[in-house]
Amino acid sequence: MRNLCFVFIFISLLAHGSTHGPDSCNHDRGLCRVGNCNPGEYLAKYCFEPVILCCKPLSPTPTKT
């Protein structure tokens, strides 16, 4: 019974809201953070809604050419 409850909670977390997962956040130059974004970052989307946020820097990072 405990395993069934764990599976139910896991499935409900995966299906909740418009979550994108850490791969999508990292691909877009963001970082998944728990709670709040750091100063100089903004909330772009959720890695796992509503707890884990996808935070991106306010200014774009320069790229080397």
From Swiss-Prot:
Provide the alphabetized UniProt keywords. Antibiotic, Antimicrobial, Defensin, Disulfide bond, Secreted, Signal
Which cysteines link up through disulfide bonds? 25-54, 32-47, 37-55
The biological process GO terms on file are: defense response to bacterium
The main location is secreted
One Gene Ontology term, aspect cellular component: extracellular region
Answer yes or no on keyword Signal.
Answer: yes
Signal peptide range: 1-19
| Family, similarity comment | Belongs to the beta-defensin family.
| Function noted in UniProt | Has bactericidal activity.
Q: What is this protein called?
A: Gallinacin-12
Q: Which gene name does the record give?
A: GAL12
